[in-house]
From Swiss-Prot:
Cofactor(s) the protein needs: Mg(2+)
Keywords recorded for this protein, A-Z: Cytolysis, Dermonecrotic toxin, Disulfide bond, Glycoprotein, Hemolysis, Lipid degradation, Lipid metabolism, Lyase, Magnesium, Metal-binding, Secreted, Signal, Toxin, Zymogen
Gene Ontology CC: extracellular region
Enzyme Commission number, as recorded: 4.6.1.-
Protein name stated in the entry: Dermonecrotic toxin LiSicTox-alphaIA2bi
GO biological process: killing of cells of another organism; lipid catabolic process
Reaction it catalyzes: an N-(acyl)-sphingosylphosphocholine = an N-(acyl)-sphingosyl-1,3-cyclic phosphate + choline; an N-(acyl)-sphingosylphosphoethanolamine = an N-(acyl)-sphingosyl-1,3-cyclic phosphate + ethanolamine; a 1-acyl-sn-glycero-3-phosphocholine = a 1-acyl-sn-glycero-2,3-cyclic phosphate + choline; a 1-acyl-sn-glycero-3-phosphoethanolamine = a 1-acyl-sn-glycero-2,3-cyclic phosphate + ethanolamine
C-alpha cells in the first residue's frame, strides 16, 4: 500500500507544480522581447547566436537575375566589427535552419522561435517581385517546412526593403495556396524595412491585402547614430487600437545605453550583433520586472496589451 500512496503523492506534486507554472505563465504581465541575432548567414552562426542569448535571428537573402533566392549573403558594407562575407546556398541554409528548429532533431535549439528573412530585392525589377515571392515560397515549403511534414517550427518574417515590392507578399501566399499549404501562412509575418513614412507603409499593406502579422522595423547600421522618433511613431500606431502594426523592432542595437532607450520606448524586439548585451540589460533591476525573453508560446503576431 505504501508504494501506491507514495506514487499518488508524487503525481499530485508534479501536477500541482505544472498547474502553478501554467498560472504563473498566464499571469506574467511583462512584455515579451525578441532578441534578434543580426546577419546570421552561415549555418554555424545559428548555434553561435542562440548560445549568446538570441531567441530569433535575421538572415539576408540575395536573389539571382531570375528572381530565385540564391544565397544567404550580405556583402560589404555591413555593420562595424562584423565580417560581411559569410554565406551559404539559400536552400542549404534552410535545411540547417530546419534542423535547428525541429523538435527531436539532434541539432534542435528550442529557444530559436522566429527568423527574419531580410530579402535583398534591390537587385530585382519591380515586375519581378511577385515571381520572387512565389519562388521563395516554393523553396521554404520544400527545404524548411519539409512539404508540410514535420518541418521547422519557427515563425517567419518576410522583410522587404522597397514598398514597391509589395507584390512579393501576394506571390508568396498564392504559391503556398497553389501547393496545398495555405495554413503555413499562419507562421508568416511581414515587415517593410526601408524606414519609409508609417502612412506609406500602411498604404503598401492595403495594396497587398494584408491586415495582421505585421512587424515594423526601424534602424540603421551600428556605424551610425539614429534617434527613436520613427520608432515612437510606429509604437503609437501599434498601441492606437486601430493601427496596422502588431510589433516593433529596432536595429542595430549593440550598446547597453541604446538597449535601455529602445526598451523604455516600448519596442517588442531588438536586432543586435551581441545578444548577450541585450540579455544582460533585460536582467537589470529596472527591466527584469517589465520585460522577459519571448518563448514559443508568445504569439509574434499578437499586439501586447499591458
Amino acid at each position: 500500500m505504501l508504494p501506491y500512496i507514495a506514487l499518488i503523492l508524487v503525481c499530485w506534486s508534479v501536477l500541482s507544480q505544472a498547474a502553478q507554472t501554467d498560472v504563473e505563465g498566464r499571469a506574467d504581465k511583462r512584455r515579451p522581447i525578441w532578441i534578434m541575432g543580426h546577419m546570421v548567414n552561415a549555418i554555424a552562426q545559428i548555434d553561435e547566436f542562440v548560445n549568446l542569448g538570441a531567441n530569433s535571428i535575421e538572415t539576408d537573402v540575395s536573389f539571382d537575375d531570375n528572381a530565385n533566392p540564391e544565397y544567404t549573403y550580405h556583402g560589404v558594407p555591413c555593420d562595424c566589427g562584423r565580417s560581411c562575407l559569410k554565406w551559404e546556398n539559400f536552400n542549404d541554409f534552410l535545411k540547417g535552419l530546419r534542423s535547428a528548429t525541429t523538435p527531436g532533431n539532434a541539432k534542435y535549439q528550442a529557444k530559436l522561435i522566429l527568423v527574419v528573412f531580410d530579402l535583398k530585392t534591390g537587385s530585382l525589377y519591380d515586375n519581378q517581385a511577385n515571381e520572387a515571392g512565389k519562388k521563395l515560397a516554393k523553396n521554404l515549403l520544400k527545404h524548411y517546412w519539409n512539404n508540410g511534414n514535420n518541418g521547422g517550427r519557427a515563425y517567419i518574417v518576410l522583410s522587404i526593403p522597397d514598398l514597391n515590392h509589395y507584390p512579393l507578399i501576394k506571390g508568396f501566399k498564392d504559391q503556398l495556396t497553389q501547393d496545398g499549404h495555405p495554413e503555413l501562412m499562419d507562421k508568416v509575418g511581414h515587415d517593410f524595412s526601408g524606414n519609409d513614412a508609417i502612412g506609406d507603409v500602411g498604404n503598401a499593406y492595403k495594396k497587398a491585402g494584408i491586415s495582421g502579422h505585421v512587424w515594423q522595423s526601424d534602424g540603421i547600421t551600428n556605424c551610425l547614430l539614429r534617434g527613436l522618433d520613427r520608432v515612437k511613431q510606429a509604437i503609437a500606431n501599434r498601441d492606437s487600437g486601430n493601427g496596422f502594426i502588431n510589433k516593433v523592432y529596432y536595429w542595430t542595437v549593440d550598446k547597453r545605453a541604446t538597449t535601455r532607450d529602445a526598451l523604455d520606448a516600448g519596442v517588442d524586439g531588438v536586432m543586435t550583433n551581441y545578444p548577450d548585451v541585450i540579455t544582460d540589460v533585460l536582467n537589470e533591476s529596472a527591466y527584469k520586472n517589465k520585460f522577459r525573453v519571448a518563448s514559443y508560446e508568445d504569439n509574434p503576431w499578437e499586439t501586447f496589451k499591458k
